[in-house]
Amino acid sequence: MLQKISQRLLEIVDALPLRKGIRILEIGCGSGVAAREIVNRLQGVYVLGIDRLLKGIEQAKKSSKTEIANGKLNFIQAKVEEFNLPEKEQLFDIAFAIRVGALDGRHPEIEKRALEIISKALKKTGRLFIDGGDPLKEINLINISS
């Protein structure tokens, strides 16, 4: 069963700098609600969703069969701090993370590793957005290095 997007998540998607042809990495995608909303808004958009929980990834895949078959979406089970960009994947224009513990400031070493990995998955002009702003805030990745 498809989940309806919440008002909060809708506001977050609205705040993203979306454009035709953009490639997006969603960290902590859960059941894929935001990813589906994004790919159904614009043509040529691609979202790779990752989540540490297999249950969320299974639900996302089950609810997104058409979008996956059309090459608009993919989902991978992975912790962001251990994520390796698959060889077939190109770099991303933006990444966003909502309620992701590795990026909430409570675990500095995990957060440092996660930011290094995200930085490697983004194009040089890539941008990272996390919750905590109005509704998002951008994280500067310029000085992030491994």
Where do the language-model regions lie?
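A short acidic, Gly/Pro-enriched loop at the edge of an enzyme's catalytic core
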Residues: 85-95
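A short glycine-rich, Lys/Arg-flanked "PGG" loop and its adjoining helix->strand segment in the class I
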Residues: 111-124
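Conserved SAM/SAH-binding beta-strand->alpha-helix loop
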Residues: 53
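Conserved beta-strand signature within the Rossmann-like core of class I S-adenosyl-L-methionine
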Residues: 125-132
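Conserved alpha-helix/loop element of class I SAM-dependent methyltransferases that forms part
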Residues: 3-22
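Conserved SAM-binding loop
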Residues: 60-61
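Conserved SAM-binding strand-loop segment of SAM-dependent methyltransferases
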Residues: 69-82
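Conserved SAM-binding loop of SAM-dependent methyltransferases across substrates and taxa
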Residues: 31-43
